[in-house]
Protein backbone atom coordinates (compact mmCIF):
# COMPACT_ATOMS: atom_id res chain seq x y z
CA UNK A 1 0.00 0.00 0.00
CA UNK A 2 2.85 2.36 0.86
CA UNK A 3 4.44 1.82 -2.55
CA UNK A 4 1.15 2.64 -4.29
CA UNK A 5 0.95 5.95 -2.41
CA UNK A 6 4.50 6.79 -3.47
CA UNK A 7 3.72 5.97 -7.11
CA UNK A 8 0.53 8.05 -7.04
CA UNK A 9 2.38 10.95 -5.43
CA UNK A 10 5.06 10.79 -8.10
CA UNK A 11 2.52 10.65 -10.93
CA UNK A 12 0.58 13.58 -9.46
CA UNK A 13 3.74 15.68 -9.11
CA UNK A 14 4.82 14.86 -12.66
CA UNK A 15 1.40 15.84 -13.99
CA UNK A 16 1.67 19.22 -12.29
CA UNK A 17 4.93 20.14 -14.02
CA UNK A 18 4.48 22.73 -16.75
CA UNK A 19 4.53 21.38 -20.25
CA UNK A 20 6.98 23.27 -22.40
CA UNK A 21 6.34 23.37 -26.11
CA UNK A 22 8.61 25.15 -28.53
CA UNK A 23 6.80 27.75 -30.55
CA UNK A 24 7.85 27.04 -34.10
CA UNK A 25 6.82 28.78 -37.29
CA UNK A 26 3.72 30.82 -36.49
CA UNK A 27 1.52 33.71 -37.60
CA UNK A 28 1.47 35.43 -34.22
CA UNK A 29 2.23 39.06 -33.54
CA UNK A 30 0.76 42.26 -32.20
CA UNK A 31 -2.98 42.48 -31.64
CA UNK A 32 -2.94 44.98 -34.51
CA UNK A 33 -1.97 42.25 -36.99
CA UNK A 34 -5.60 41.29 -37.39
CA UNK A 35 -6.67 44.86 -38.15
CA UNK A 36 -4.76 45.14 -41.38
CA UNK A 37 -6.41 44.31 -44.66
CA UNK A 38 -4.62 42.63 -47.50
CA UNK A 39 -1.69 40.31 -47.63
CA UNK A 40 1.19 42.44 -46.36
CA UNK A 41 3.39 39.38 -45.85
CA UNK A 42 3.68 38.94 -49.62
CA UNK A 43 4.75 42.59 -50.01
CA UNK A 44 7.37 42.18 -47.27
CA UNK A 45 8.60 38.93 -48.84
CA UNK A 46 8.81 40.50 -52.30
CA UNK A 47 10.89 43.41 -50.94
CA UNK A 48 13.32 41.07 -49.22
CA UNK A 49 13.60 38.66 -52.14
CA UNK A 50 14.20 41.57 -54.49
CA UNK A 51 17.27 42.63 -52.51
CA UNK A 52 19.02 39.44 -51.43
CA UNK A 53 22.42 41.12 -51.25
CA UNK A 54 21.60 42.67 -47.87
CA UNK A 55 22.73 41.28 -44.55
CA UNK A 56 20.04 41.12 -41.87
CA UNK A 57 21.36 41.67 -38.34
CA UNK A 58 19.29 41.53 -35.15
CA UNK A 59 16.92 44.47 -34.77
CA UNK A 60 17.53 45.96 -38.22
CA UNK A 61 14.33 46.55 -40.19
CA UNK A 62 15.19 45.53 -43.74
CA UNK A 63 11.76 45.08 -45.34
CA UNK A 64 8.77 47.18 -44.33
CA UNK A 65 5.39 48.57 -45.25
CA UNK A 66 4.94 52.04 -43.78
CA UNK A 67 1.50 53.27 -42.73
CA UNK A 68 0.15 56.52 -41.34
CA UNK A 69 0.03 55.10 -37.83
CA UNK A 70 1.83 51.90 -37.16
CA UNK A 71 3.87 50.07 -39.76
CA UNK A 72 4.83 46.48 -40.39
CA UNK A 73 8.46 45.43 -40.56
CA UNK A 74 10.60 42.30 -40.88
CA UNK A 75 13.61 41.82 -38.62
CA UNK A 76 15.83 39.20 -36.98
CA UNK A 77 15.56 38.67 -33.22
CA UNK A 78 16.35 36.23 -30.38
CA UNK A 79 19.91 35.73 -31.66
CA UNK A 80 23.19 37.62 -31.94
CA UNK A 81 23.80 36.30 -35.45
CA UNK A 82 23.12 38.01 -38.77
CA UNK A 83 21.59 36.19 -41.74
CA UNK A 84 21.98 36.72 -45.47
CA UNK A 85 19.32 38.29 -47.65
CA UNK A 86 18.90 34.91 -49.32
CA UNK A 87 18.12 33.33 -45.94
CA UNK A 88 15.69 36.15 -45.13
CA UNK A 89 13.92 35.55 -48.45
CA UNK A 90 13.61 31.84 -47.64
CA UNK A 91 12.21 32.49 -44.14
CA UNK A 92 9.68 35.02 -45.44
CA UNK A 93 8.64 32.56 -48.14
CA UNK A 94 8.14 29.99 -45.37
CA UNK A 95 5.78 32.42 -43.61
CA UNK A 96 3.81 33.06 -46.81
CA UNK A 97 3.57 29.31 -47.46
CA UNK A 98 2.48 28.76 -43.85
CA UNK A 99 -0.51 31.05 -44.50
CA UNK A 100 0.67 34.13 -42.61
CA UNK A 101 -0.85 37.28 -44.12
CA UNK A 102 0.44 40.09 -41.89
CA UNK A 103 2.54 38.94 -38.93
CA UNK A 104 4.56 35.87 -38.02
CA UNK A 105 7.90 34.35 -37.10
CA UNK A 106 10.03 31.62 -38.65
CA UNK A 107 12.83 29.89 -36.70
CA UNK A 108 16.31 30.53 -38.08
CA UNK A 109 17.75 27.18 -37.07
CA UNK A 110 16.85 23.50 -37.14
CA UNK A 111 14.54 22.33 -34.40
CA UNK A 112 11.64 24.69 -35.21
CA UNK A 113 12.28 26.72 -32.03
CA UNK A 114 11.95 30.51 -32.35
CA UNK A 115 13.60 31.02 -28.94
CA UNK A 116 16.98 30.24 -30.56
CA UNK A 117 16.59 32.87 -33.31
CA UNK A 118 13.83 33.98 -35.61
CA UNK A 119 12.91 36.19 -38.51
CA UNK A 120 9.83 38.11 -37.39
CA UNK A 121 7.28 40.25 -39.21
CA UNK A 122 5.30 42.43 -36.82
CA UNK A 123 3.86 45.87 -36.22
CA UNK A 124 6.30 48.59 -35.21
CA UNK A 125 5.72 52.16 -34.07
CA UNK A 126 7.44 53.82 -37.00
CA UNK A 127 9.28 53.06 -40.20
From Swiss-Prot:
Q: Which cysteines are joined by disulfide bonds?
A: 27-100, 33-103, 49-89, 57-82, 66-127
InterPro entries, alphabetically?
Killer_tox_Kp4, Killer_tox_Kp4/SMK
Keyword presence, Lipoprotein: no
User: Can you say where in the cell this protein is located?
Assistant: Secreted
Its practical application is:
The KP4 toxin expressed in transgenic plant can render them resistant to KP4-susceptible fungal pathogens such as grass smut fungi. Successful tests have been made in tobacco and wheat.
Q: Fetch the Pfam families from UniProt.
A: Kp4
Please list which residues make up the signal peptide. Answer: 1-22
GO terms for cellular component: extracellular region
Major localisation: secreted
Give GO MF terms, alphabetically: toxin activity
Keywords (alphabetical) are: Disulfide bond, Secreted, Signal, Toxin
Q: What does this protein do?
A: This protein is lethal to sensitive cells of the same or related species. It specifically inhibits voltage-gated calcium channels. It inhibits cell growth and division by blocking calcium import.
**What is its quaternary makeup?**
Monomer.
**Name of this chain's protein:** KP4 killer toxin
- The protein's organism comes out as Ustilago maydis P4 virus
Amino acid sequence: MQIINVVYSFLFAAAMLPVVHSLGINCRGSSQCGLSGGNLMVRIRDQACGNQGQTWCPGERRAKVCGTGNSISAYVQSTNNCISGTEACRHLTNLVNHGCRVCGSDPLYAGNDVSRGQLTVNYVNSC
